[in-house]
C-alpha cells in the first residue's frame, strides 16, 4: 500500500514534468530563437516547425508527448488507483498548458495529451492520433486537426470501454 502522501507528490511531480518546456530546450539545442518570439508565440512543436527546423520540431513533439506518456506510465507501474492516475494525467497536461517555468504561459498541449492518451489506453490514443493525421493531411492545419481529433475522443472512450473514470479525464483533455 502506498503512503497517503504519495498521490499528491505524484501529482506535483507530474505537474513539474509537464512544465518542462521542450520547445525552449530544443530551440536552444538547435540554435533557434525563442519560439515565443515568432509565429503564434506558442512554445510548442508546431511553432518550432515554423522556424523551418524540422528536427527541432520533432524533438519538441517527442519530448512533449513523452512527458505525458511517462507521467501516466510511472503512475500505473507504481500501482496507483485509476483516480490517482487520472489526477496525474491531468497534472502533467496542465503543467504543459500552465508551466511554472514559463510564468504559466505554455503550449496548447496537443502532443502532451496524445502521450497521456497513449499511456492510458494505446488503442484510444491511436484512434485520436489517426483522426489527427487524417485531418492534418486533408486540410494541412495542425490546429484544426487537434480540435477535430480531440472532439470525438470521449466518444471513442465510451465506445471502447463504456463510461468510467477515464472518460472524465479524456473529456477534460478534449475540452482543454
How does the language model describe each region?
Residues 49-52, 75-78, 110-139, 151-161:
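Interfacial segments of multi-pass membrane proteins
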Residues 33-42, 101-114, 141-149:
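Short, non-helical or kinked segments that cap or interrupt transmembrane helices
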Residues 6, 10, 56-62, 66-100, ...:
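Nucleotide and nucleotide-moiety/phosphate-recognizing core
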Residues 5-30:
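N-terminal signal-anchor transmembrane alpha helix
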Residues 14-19, 92-96, 132-136, 153, ...:
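Alpha-helical transmembrane segments of multi-pass membrane proteins
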Residues 24-56:
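Cytosolic, membrane-interface loops and tails of multi-pass inner-membrane proteins
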Residues 23-26, 46-47, 95-105, 132-139:
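C-terminal ends of transmembrane helices
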Residues 126, 142-150, 163-174:
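Loop-to-transmembrane alpha-helix initiation sites
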Amino acid at each position: 500500500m502506498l503512503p497517503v502522501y504519495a498521490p499528491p507528490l505524484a501529482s506535483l511531480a507530474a505537474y513539474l514534468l509537464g512544465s518542462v518546456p521542450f520547445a525552449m530546450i530544443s530551440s536552444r539545442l538547435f540554435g533557434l530563437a525563442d519560439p515565443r518570439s515568432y509565429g503564434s508565440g506558442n512554445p510548442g512543436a508546431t511553432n518550432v516547425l515554423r522556424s523551418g527546423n524540422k528536427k527541432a520540431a520533432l524533438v519538441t513533439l517527442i519530448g512533449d508527448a513523452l512527458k505525458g506518456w511517462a507521467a501516466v506510465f510511472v503512475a500505473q507501474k507504481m500501482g496507483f488507483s485509476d483516480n490517482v492516475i487520472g489526477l496525474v494525467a491531468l497534472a502533467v497536461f496542465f503543467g504543459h498548458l500552465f508551466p511554472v517555468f514559463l510564468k504559466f504561459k505554455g503550449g496548447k498541449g496537443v502532443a502532451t495529451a496524445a502521450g497521456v492518451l497513449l499511456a492510458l489506453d494505446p488503442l484510444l490514443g491511436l484512434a485520436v492520433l489517426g483522426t489527427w493525421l487524417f485531418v492534418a493531411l486533408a486540410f494541412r492545419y495542425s490546429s484544426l486537426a487537434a480540435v477535430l481529433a480531440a472532439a470525438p475522443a470521449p466518444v471513442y472512450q465510451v465506445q471502447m470501454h463504456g463510461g468510467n473514470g477515464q472518460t472524465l479525464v479524456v473529456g477534460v483533455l478534449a475540452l482543454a
